Amino acid sequence: MIWQFGEIGYDISINDGDRVDKKPYKAPEYLKVAERKALYDTYAMLLKFRKDNPRFFDGDVNFRWAVGSSNQKERHIYSSSADGKHYALFGNFGTGTQTISVNLPSGVSKWYQYDNGAEWNGSSHSPSMAEGQFYLLVSDRSMCLR
């Protein structure tokens, strides 16, 4: 669930007045700020992925969520659908750059970045990732935005 204006980084507390009080509408003003526009675009991309790929969110899927017990700064989500398609989402949620060890599910030789179609070969990777950086990989290039 995205709280009202959460996709643009609203600048007052959610509890300002009350959680469900009407909040000032500032989206046109906020979207002129590059960082807020980037956040909005990220939400839009992830919501488009979900809308275009119900196979991963409804019905018969395998889902694996990995959060390091000693390192809460990285997250990994892997899912596969009954029709043989896969996605992997992983990111750095720490406050600085770090190397993330990624072991993608076996059985897929090529992965593609959802946002730009860049190829990832093999299953083992250790990308250096800036704080807040994430990758959404898919097993079929036709699922990519570009």
What residue ranges belong to the model's regions?
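Glycan-recognition and catalytic regions of carbohydrate-active enzymes
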Residues: 2-87
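C-terminal beta-strand-rich structural cap/linker in extracellular carbohydrate-active enzymes
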Residues: 122-146
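Short, solvent-exposed loop/turn segments at secondary-structure junctions
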Residues: 7-11, 64, 93-96, 141-144
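Conserved active-site loop/cleft motifs that coordinate metal ions or position small ligands
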Residues: 1-5, 88-91, 112-113, 138
